[in-house]
A protein has these predicted regions:
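ALDH superfamily catalytic-core signature
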Residues: 311-316, 338-339, 344, 351-491, ...
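Extended, hydrophobic alpha-helical segments in both membrane/secreted and soluble proteins
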Residues: 201-202, 216-220, 224, 228-231, ...
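Conserved small-residue-rich beta-alpha loop and adjacent elements
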Residues: 251-320, 385, 606, 653-720
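Positively charged, amphipathic and often flexible ligand-engagement surfaces
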Residues: 1-99, 107, 752-760
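Intrinsic disorder at enzyme termini
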Residues: 54-162, 593-616
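Catalytic cores of nucleotide-enabled group-transfer and carboxylate-activating enzymes in metabolic
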Residues: 1, 169-182, 191-212, 219-222, ...
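N-terminal alpha-helical segment of soluble enzymes
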Residues: 143-224, 228, 410, 414, ...
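Short, well-ordered beta-strand elements within core beta-sheets of diverse protein domains
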Residues: 164-171, 185-192, 377-379, 408-414, ...
Length: 819
């Protein structure tokens, strides 16, 4: 009767129900339970539908709700406005990004009504992520179809590529010399512009990238084989970088006790797999800091980078400050990468590429995001259906050509023998639509180049004990189109366990326990992304405490990091140099150096504002310090505590997804973890600078190995020897510079904080002695009292993204888990 009544009124009624084979009935259970739970809720009229004619109370409840809804509608100025109103066609016709973006409401707009941001607010008060395209809207689907049609014949960016080509040989090297000299000179003028002016230009750049979303997706589809679903969020990321760095650069002027000076010249060498977002990220961060930029695009995606650069030029970035140079991959490219006038080199690519660049110039100041061998652990307490969906999406998006892609699944306990898991995985993988990026229905697009070398081996050759659960197949004669593959039986230490392949192939490993699975996950040389699927809060907590990666994901996919929400960057060989996370609060700091602010000495011995741990170290060091040095160290200890309270000692979720509706649905937390560092005080280094750096290490809780050319104060050594000091010194060695260098060649510590009268020269000599070893990162900046600066070498950033709901309903077990 109800169905007939609805049909008579609206003319059409759709009835739907899950249809499954009897043996797969459990696959429908979760859906049916969600519907039952939803319909049984007292907020839903269906909960009383069978009692309306029998219960006056239920009838009156529903009558009251109905009349109240009519009254609310009549009181409103009009019909309720739809929330989903995005129209890329309308935006395109208007010639701008979405209404309300920073580009439309005025660059540098503040959500707090204007004026200066509060201290330590950073970008938290004035930044919102760009919205990806809502493909449920008819206008947007029409917009997408027009992009794919244009992509068939597009030549966007080609004119700039042709005009920027550098020839090979001596003439090309000479051209590089001219470009470097001219751009470096322009960098000085760019740095001289005010922070407000540079910020306005970057906000305008974000608006221009938004306006050219279609152009950027078009050229990426044509040149890089990116589907609409992959290209659209990449443009959003580029837009986010512009607005985020436009605001985070302001923090550089608010750091206490230190003055920031940008480097003059940065070279950006982006990858082909994210030719717009990652290229834009490096360029925009350098520009935000005040550095001029030369971008050398990846040979496979020159036009995509060119269209991005043209958008930045058209938004107000001076052409002499941002240079597009298409240098060949020979001695000319080497002349640019290894040029002594290059102050920063931003690289995203293989660890081996970073090693190659360091072999050309051992001291090249590299900020690199490198390789990943990423795994998702799935435990028996996981939601198997969701785990499979996230695993497949993470493994085969962009044909697996992401450094963050899941190339391993580690199945714990009964999951490893689960017929249901295997059946779901095979079904999900074999039903992925593989094809051209110019086909709107394609899910897995082509490889950037024909499969060759180690990738071809991964797609065609099994190791001993392995077999194909789903065997990959070449689908055309080009060698670029492959159906996804899944290999079983991958064992610890095998090539597939530890090697990055960068293609559509997934390996399956088995573990008896979560602890064993973690050992497998942590056993690779890399630490970029890592995932866990488990609904058990104890398992999640244990995993979060022990996993070794920069970006962690719980009960969701492990790709698609979003600016600010999940700042991106890895541990171990997934990162080279002293870099911090892209899209995070410290990234722009890497494009310059800090010098101490001239301070007035406090005529007091008071230690107010100094933490208890720092107090004991400072008091033990006091006999070896002049009063000026003591005062500088004390100021540093106070600043350390402030930085700890504001940034490093808190696990903060700036995005607060769902908070406006009363429930956090996804927790995105940036936290900091202490890491081991070798602290070296070179010959003629002041004792107070060593003590100041050790105080930063103590506040961070980092384990340190101390090497000093002069003996430490006896009282400080005595404190260290107790083993209960906040200064966690594993060793203390007094030695010459020559002896330290010789010992470093043997030990090769991952991080060195180098204190020397000429830190740059000392670091250069050490890098050369190490032959540019990319596994060793050296911090050699002038020692300051700024805790926001000095704590960074002793901490590793870690971004945690955790799904805090179950099908839209809050899941307190994970929503309230301490992070």
């Amino acid at each position: 009767d109800q169905a007939d009544a609805v049909r008579r009124t609206v003319g059409h009624l759709l009835l739907y129900t899950p249809v499954v084979h009897p043996s797969d009935f459990d696959s429908a259970i979760s859906y049916l339970i969600r519907r039952l739970e939803e319909n049984a809720s007292t907020e839903n009229f269906l909960s009383g539908v069978f009692e309306l004619t029998r219960s006056p109370h239920i009838f009156e409840r529903e009558e009251l709700r109905f009349r109240e809804s009519l009254a609310a509608f009549e009181a409103a100025p009009g019909a309720p406005v739809a929330h989903r109103v995005q129209s890329r066609l309308a935006e395109q016709a208007f010639g701008s990004g979405p209404a309300g973006s920073a580009a439309d409401v005025g660059v540098g707009a503040r959500v707090d009504g204007g004026g200066e941001l509060p201290e330590h607010a950073g970008v938290r008060a004035g930044f919102d992520n760009a919205a990806d395209t809502d493909t449920a809207m008819p206008d947007n689907r029409e917009w997408g179809r027009s992009i794919l049609k244009s992509a068939q014949t597009t030549t966007r960016g080609q004119a700039l590529v042709d005009a920027s080509a550098v020839e090979s040989g001596a003439a090309g090297v000479a051209a590089i010399e001219r470009v470097v000299a001219e751009t470096r000179l322009a960098g000085a003028a760019w740095a001289a512009r005010s922070v407000d002016e540079r910020s306005r230009i970057l906000h305008a750049a974000g608006g221009m990238l938004s306006a050219r979303r279609a152009d950027l997706i078009e050229v990426m589809a044509a040149e890089a084989g990116k589907t609409l679903a992959e290209g659209d969020p990449e443009v959003s990321e580029a837009i986010d970088f512009a607005h985020y760095y436009a605001e985070s650069m302001r923090e550089l002027t608010r750091i206490d006790h230190a003055i920031f000076t940008p480097v003059q010249l940065t070279v950006v060498a982006p990858p082909w797999n994210f030719p717009v977002a990652i290229a834009a990220g490096g360029v925009l961060a350098a520009l935000a800091a005040g550095s001029a930029v030369i971008i050398k695009p990846a040979p496979q995606t020159r036009r995509s980078a060119a269209v991005m650069v043209e958008a930045l030029w058209d938004s107000g970035v001076p052409r002499e400050v941002l240079r597009f140079v298409d240098a060949p991959e020979n001695e000319v490219g080497r002349a640019l990468i290894a040029h002594p006038a290059v102050d920063r080199l931003v690289l995203t690519g293989a660890w081996e590429t970073a090693a190659l660049f360091r072999s050309w110039r051992p001291d090249v100041p590299i900020l690199a995001e490198t390789s990943g061998k990423n795994a998702i652990i799935i435990t028996p307490s996981a939601d198997i259906d969701l785990a499979v969906a996230d695993l497949v999406r993470s493994a085969f998006g962009h044909a697996g050509q992401k450094c963050s892609a899941a190339s391993l699944a580690i199945l714990v306990g009964s999951v490893a023998t689960s017929a249901r898991f295997e059946r779901q995985l095979v079904d999900a993988v074999t039903t992925l639509r593989v094809g051209s990026a110019l086909d709107a229905t394609t899910v897995v697009g082509p490889l950037i180049e024909p499969a060759a070398g180690k990738l071809l081996g991964a797609l065609t050759v099994l190791e001993e004990g392995e077999d194909w659960l789903v065997e990959p197949q070449p689908l055309d004669a080009t060698g670029t189109l492959w159906s996804p593959g899944v290999r079983r039986g991958v064992v610890a230490g095998s090539a597939f366990h530890t090697t990055e392949y960068f293609g559509p192939v997934l390996g399956i490993m088995r573990a008896r326990t979560l602890e064993e699975a973690l050992e497998l996950q942590n056993a690779t040389p890399f630490g970029l992304t890592a995932g866990l699927h488990s609904l058990d809060p104890d398992e999640v907590g244990y995993w979060l405490d022990h996993v070794e990666a920069g970006n962690l994901y719980v009960n969701r996919g492990i790709t698609g990091a979003i600016v600010r929400r999940q700042p991106f960057g890895g541990w171990k060989r997934s990162s080279v140099g002293g870099s911090t996370k892209a899209g995070g609060p410290s990234y722009v700091m890497g494009f310059g150096s800090f010098t101490p602010v001239v301070r007035t000495v406090r005529e007091s011995l008071s230690l107010r504002g100094v933490s208890d741990g720092a107090r004991e170290v400072l008091e033990a060091s006091q006999p070896g310090l002049e009063f000026d040095g003591f005062d500088a160290v004390r100021a540093g200890a106070v600043s350390d505590q402030r930085a700890w309270d504001d940034e490093f000692g808190v696990a903060r979720d700036d995005s607060q997804l769902g908070a406006e509706f009363g429930e956090i649905v996804e927790r995105n937390v940036l936290r900091y973890r202490p890491t081991a560092v070798t602290v070296r005080a070179a010959e003629r280094a002041p004792t107070y600078e060593l003590v100041r750096v050790l105080l930063a290490a103590a506040r961070a809780g980092a384990r340190v190995d101390i090497s000093s050319a002069i003996p430490l104060p006896a009282s400080l050594l005595a404190l260290i020897s107790t083993g209960i000091s906040s200064l966690r010194a594993a060793s203390v060695v007094t030695e010459t510079d020559a002896r330290f260098t010789a010992r470093t060649l043997e030990v090769r510590p991952a991080r060195i904080r180098l204190i020397a009268p000429d830190g740059a020269a000392a670091a250069r000599a050490l890098h050369e002695a190490l032959d540019g070893d990319p596994d060793v990162a050296i911090w050699s900046g002038v020692v300051t009292a700024a805790g926001r600066v000095e704590l960074l070498p002793f901490l590793r950033e870690q971004a945690v993204s955790l799904t805090a709901h179950r099908f839209g309903n809050p899941y307190p077990a994970l929503a309230e888990l301490a992070l």
